[in-house]
Amino acid sequence: MKRTTTIKIVLVAIFSIVSMTSVRAQRVALTSNLLEDVVLAPNLGVEVVFADTQSLFLEATVAPFKLTNHYYNKCLSFRAGYKYWFNQALYAHHLILDGVVTSSESGWGDTALRYEYLGAGLGYGYSFIINERLNLIPSIGVGVAYVRQYEGHDHMLDTGYGVQATVTGGFMPMLTRLALTLQYVLK
């Protein structure tokens, strides 16, 4: 997927979340997926409660790191979605309907793999309350994703030459969400 399309999707998601804040006073929370942090993919998200049992969220992940010349994993990912909370928003059980768009490139030795991922899924999570403002939320989700994969030598992926011969893609069932999220409630 082209970067301009990705940027448009992110802007629409941000606009949607911001427009919901004018409805009435909201609770807002900042989130970070600790599992992504462990694999050196810093991420940050925002969740806005717009009804007693409903919230919208937007998360971004970026991994620009190149560990060595022979091993690297670069990633840019955006996730937006809707949560239905069974009791009260930001507490206890909830269902998740979300979409994700990811562009990633990994390299080891002289071989490189690039993929683009566009998926949507349904998930479940539970919010463990640590204190008044801090929650820990494990969640998991499954769904369908369109994955496009490019395979070749490292120098071919950077220039684009020779990559077209090794392109594969298609729809497949996938684990669309696996998270251990630390959530800080702002208000």
Where are these regions (language model features)?
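Short strand-turn segments of transmembrane beta-barrel domains in outer membranes
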Residues: L30-D37
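Outer-membrane beta-barrel "beta-signal"
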Residues: Y82-F86, M172-K187
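Extracytoplasmic loops and strand-loop junctions of Gram-negative outer membrane beta-barrel proteins
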Residues: R27-A29, A63-P64, E105-G109, G160-V167
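Bacterial N-terminal signal peptides that target proteins for export
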Residues: M1-L11
